[in-house]
């Protein structure tokens, strides 16, 4: 058959290029409750209309490709295509637009964050028609949420397991993060836990290196947990990092942790990957282990203001994939985080239902339909003087994690832990009495110093420490 011969499949098919906006820009479209909705910050190349840029994003992240193909006639594009349904300029920014896209639920595999991201952000970010592209937010429909297990246990179950109520939980990342032997590492864990912390933590890059193999670390940390529990009468935990080079190795480490009887594990969910994270979350629920999540590599994805993906999207993805804690920024420490925006995604982690609120960066109303909540972890350059602000900003359902702010105490790890425990209990007591932590925070800490020499020493060491740098971008 010659190339010019007409076949039934080619009837009505016209080869060649067609503008994306003719098919994928549909401003009259009314979104469905079952659609996944996305808000993209789009910066088109010069000469590319915003309608064409928005349509290109919707097309390339769903059914479209660069040319017309005859196999379009073998399916229903109206049923399966993504749609750019609304475009608005970004106030104060030149040639930037928020383009809203809707995706039919049938495009996505049930219970798979991996597939969701592969579709929505997997290919389109390298598109030549765009100078920059950032995914600002997603609306996950109830029908899709219900296909996920979510966090292994959630906030209330964790508090019940730990028998700890009415205050933020306290943690500490063991430093130096690399180079300690397993025995010395376990000793540092023990000192922090016996001093009054609830948790200690492996740093994100502690896996199984020559200086400290994972099995040795797990054993010495378990010993530290049991010894500190016996001395204090409180339930303690250490985030044992199970992240590994393969899923099989990760699960092997999780099984060993369960056999030791420790309460929790840890995973680096972005470097480890969503498939591995979801597998570990399922294992943790089935075996009664809490799961702490570190967001190592997040700033590679979310730091730029006009390209990449906002952390609120990564936070939503984590709640679907599964984790009981996740690092969320501090607002007050050494790592970047604006207060209103940070509290916006903190609510997305903890609450069942969150209303649209653009002032906090929330583009869509999100209903989690009883999916368990995730505890935000404030960590990075914080110390006892930050305690009133952290307690006021994050509330009780949070983990306040002081690494250098514990281990840097001039008297040692245990006194550093005592200082943090005294500070948080003083702040909670003052708050419960009706005092204003924002206005009276420093006075509250100074009052507590009178009956805690450990806190007084910590306050003296860190009284001048600030992490303030002018924004350059």
From Swiss-Prot:
GO terms for molecular function: magnesium ion binding; monooxygenase activity; ribulose-bisphosphate carboxylase activity. Substrate binds at residues 123, 173, 177, 295, 327, 379. The keyword Acetylation applies. The modification N-acetylproline is found at residue 3. The modification N6-carboxylysine is found at residue 201. Mg(2+) binds at residues 201, 203-204. Keywords: Acetylation, Calvin cycle, Carbon dioxide fixation, Chloroplast, Disulfide bond, Lyase, Magnesium, Metal-binding, Methylation, Monooxygenase, Oxidoreductase, Photorespiration, Photosynthesis, Plastid. One of its GO terms (cellular component) is chloroplast. The keyword NAD does not apply. Transmembrane segments: none annotated. Gene3D superfamilies: Ribulose bisphosphate carboxylase, large subunit, C-terminal domain, RuBisCO large subunit, N-terminal domain. Residues 1-2 form a propeptide. The disulfide bond which can form in the large chain dimeric partners within the hexadecamer appears to be associated with oxidative stress and protein turnover. Binds 1 Mg(2+) ion per subunit. InterPro entries: RuBisCO (IPR033966), RuBisCo_large_chain_AS (IPR020878), RuBisCO_lsu_C (IPR000685), RuBisCO_lsu_C_sf (IPR036376), RuBisCO_lsu_fd_N (IPR017443), RuBisCO_lsu_N_sf (IPR036422), RuBisCO_lsuI (IPR020888). Its main location: plastid. GO terms for biological process: photorespiration; reductive pentose-phosphate cycle. The modification N6,N6,N6-trimethyllysine is found at residue 14. Its cofactor is Mg(2+). It holds the Pfam family RuBisCO_large_N. Heterohexadecamer of 8 large chains and 8 small chains; disulfide-linked. The disulfide link is formed within the large subunit homodimers. The basic functional RuBisCO is composed of a large chain homodimer in a 'head-to-tail' conformation. In form I RuBisCO this homodimer is arranged in a barrel-like tetramer with the small subunits forming a tetrameric 'cap' on each end of the 'barrel'. RuBisCO catalyzes two reactions: the carboxylation of D-ribulose 1,5-bisphosphate, the primary event in carbon dioxide fixation, as well as the oxidative fragmentation of the pentose substrate in the photorespiration process. Both reactions occur simultaneously and in competition at the same active site. This is Ribulose bisphosphate carboxylase large chain. The lineage of its organism: Eukaryota, Viridiplantae, Streptophyta, Embryophyta, Tracheophyta.
């Amino acid at each position: 058959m010659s190339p010019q011969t007409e076949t039934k499949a080619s009837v009505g098919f016209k080869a060649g290029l067609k503008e994306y906006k003719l098919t994928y820009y549909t401003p009259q479209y009314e979104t469905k409750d079952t659609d996944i909705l996305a808000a993209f910050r789009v910066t088109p190349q010069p000469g590319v209309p915003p309608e064409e840029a928005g349509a290109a994003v919707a097309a390339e992240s769903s059914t479209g490709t660069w040319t017309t193909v005859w196999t379009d006639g073998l399916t229903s594009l109206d049923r399966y295509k993504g749609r750019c349904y609304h475009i608005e300029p970004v106030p104060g920014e030149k040639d930037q637009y928020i383009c809203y896209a809707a995706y039919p639920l049938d495009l996505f595999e049930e219970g798979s964050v991996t597939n969701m991201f592969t579709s929505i952000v997997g290919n389109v970010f390298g598109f030549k028609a765009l100078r920059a592209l950032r995914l600002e937010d997603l609306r996950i429909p109830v029908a899709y949420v219900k296909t996920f297990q979510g966090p292994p246990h959630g906030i209330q179950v964790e508090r019940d397991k730990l028998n700890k109520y009415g205050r933020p939980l306290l943690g500490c990342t063991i430093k130096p993060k690399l180079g300690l032997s397993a025995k010395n590492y376990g000793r540092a864990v023990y000192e922090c836990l016996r001093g009054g912390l609830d948790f200690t933590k492996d740093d994100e890059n502690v896996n199984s290196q020559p200086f400290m193999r994972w099995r040795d670390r797990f054993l010495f940390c378990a010993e530290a947990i049991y010894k500190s529990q016996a001395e204090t009468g409180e339930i303690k935990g250490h985030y044992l990092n199970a992240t590994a080079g393969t899923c099989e190795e990760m699960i092997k480490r999780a099984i060993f942790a369960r056999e030791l009887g420790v309460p929790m594990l840890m995973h680096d969910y972005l470097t480890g990957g969503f498939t591995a994270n979801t597998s570990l979350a399922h294992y943790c629920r089935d075996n009664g282990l809490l799961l702490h999540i570190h967001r190592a590599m997040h700033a590679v994805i979310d730091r730029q203001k006009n390209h990449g993906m906002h952390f609120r999207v990564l936070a939503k993805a984590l709640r679907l994939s599964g984790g009981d804690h996740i690092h969320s920024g501090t607002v007050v420490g050494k790592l970047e985080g604006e207060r209103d925006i940070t509290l916006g995604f903190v609510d997305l982690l903890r609450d069942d239902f969150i209303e649209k609120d653009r002032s906090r960066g929330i583009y869509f109303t999100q209903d989690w339909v009883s999916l368990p909540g995730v505890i935000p972890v404030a960590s990075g350059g914080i110390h006892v003087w930050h305690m009133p602000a952290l307690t006021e900003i994050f509330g009780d359902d949070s983990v306040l994690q002081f690494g250098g702010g514990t281990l840097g105490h001039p008297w040692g790890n245990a006194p550093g832990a005592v200082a943090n425990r005294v500070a948080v209990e003083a702040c909670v007591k003052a708050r419960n009495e009706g005092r204003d932590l924002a206005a009276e925070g420093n006075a509250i800490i100074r009052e507590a110093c009178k009956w805690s020499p450990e806190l007084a020493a910590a306050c003296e060491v860190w009284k001048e420490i600030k992490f303030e740098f002018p924004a350059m971008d």
